[in-house]
Amino acid sequence: MGEYKTPGVYIKEKNAFGNSIVEVETAVPVFIGLTEVALDGTSSLLNKPVRISSMTEYNTYFGGAPTPQFMLSSEDIKADDKDKFLFCFPDSEKKTALKCGVLGHICTLYYHMVLFFANGGGTCYVVSLGGYNADFCELYSANKDTVFANIKKEQDITMVVVPEAVNSANCMNVYTDLLKELCDKQKYFALLDVPMEAGAKTEDISDSFGTGIGTTNLQYAAAYYPWLETSVLSDADIDSRVLVWNYNAETTPSTFSGDSKVDEYIKKCITMISTSKDAAGKELKADDIQQVKTDLHNALLQNWPQYKSLAKKVKDYLNLLPPSAAMAGVYTMVDNTRGVWKAPANVSLNYVNKPAVPITGKDQEVLNMPMTGKAINAIRTFPGEGIKVWGARTLDGNSQDS
């Protein structure tokens, strides 16, 4: 009963029976991807859904963030640099350039989990397919039957998210597998990302995605576009372990800062790292070499403008993430704060600076009402309102229930 504020007779009725309906969580996603480890003590957790509710629990079972690596070199400018390197920063004389390429592949599940919890995510499950050195699609193809069987054993999972799949050329095969093998039970809902291609028209992206996704169980999936420029990683995350020098490069800049003493110090660090010996010729231990790399990184950041610009570019590159994990957090937040009857739309996103591609009203028409009915939900920026999820349709857009 409420607080008594006026005199009178009040009758308080007691419930004769308990609630007949047990309250359950309605938005519990499972994330499938690559992690640093997958251990509960000494027991392997590979291919098994593990229930967590915070990044602290994630770190306990699955380890920390990956350390993506980018190979740097200072070389003569060549005609095919744009095809071979991710970034190129020419010097003032346009003869040499600071060049950067990706070493191996980049694992992103950790960053997606940060986005999920930042946008209202709570209880969820994580399935680790393997470590950071593995290939997502290879492990997915080899273990999907086991993974799907284990997911079906958990009663409270309602959504499926595979945020790393979109980085692969085979992502549409992953999506169609999910829709065919999991969503056929009408219990699971898949959140999908739309592949991005630089310079591509919105209509072409929509058509390509619609062609690849097929026609099976589209009413149990939603797709979101575009990708997001996030703030998951900070400047401090781009350190000497991420930016790795190729010390066998063809040339070395004659000057970094123009200050002879600074340049001498930087070249001294480069020599120590490349030879694994200090100035006196003594062998350096691994920890000592790493410290020299850190000192070199800090000196270059402070004294070489091209290096500082490249570090920012690398950070922005890593912070460009597809939206499915953030949307899983939004689904959870909306269900918990408003109720399952409220659509997960017209909601702001956290840890997001802006959509990677500005979506206009015309673009939204293309995404929202394609001829095939395979609707894609847009994420847009509005003046005075910020970034909003601007759509809540399933991929079965021609359905009356969409």
Question: Whereabouts are the PLM-identified features?
Answer:
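Surface-exposed assembly/interface segments
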Residues: M1-S402
